Design a protein with these regions (language model features):
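Short linear sequence motif anchored by a di-proline
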Residues: 1-121
Length: 121
């Protein structure tokens, strides 16, 4: 996964917000990040057949882990159980990748919506 992604606030998520408003108070909803999303931001995910707000990343010894390899995820203690039992979908408009010259490139689709596979604690 990328190190940053983008959630465009112009995406029509009004129906999703109606669902979230029933679950969370306004102070919690205000934590939802839009625009450029960084690790540890609160973001919109779909898990357990419901929309939820979750912090991006795994906290481990004051570090925030955001990536793993599919080839080793089943063998890594911190991810093993969650890979089996806590899958989610991360909703985004696009994501950023950097080239070897540290230039940022924005990658998106024609309809400005991308779904990433994720796991959560």
């Amino acid at each position: 996964m990328c190190g940053r992604y983008y959630f465009d606030e112009s995406i029509d998520i009004s129906k999703i917000l109606q669902i979230l408003e029933k679950k969370y108070n306004q102070d919690t909803l205000d934590l939802l990040s839009t625009g450029e999303i960084f690790p540890s931001n609160i973001s919109l995910v779909f898990a357990n057949n419901d929309y939820q707000l979750m912090k991006w990343g795994y906290s481990l010894n004051k570090r925030n882990l955001i990536n793993t390899r599919i080839e080793t995820i089943r063998d890594t203690d911190i991810y093993r159980n969650d890979y089996q039992n806590h899958k989610c979908v991360i909703i985004a408009s696009g994501f950023y990748e950097w080239d070897r010259h540290k230039r940022r490139h924005y990658i998106t689709t024609s309809d400005n919506i991308i779904y990433f596979a994720g796991i959560y604690q």
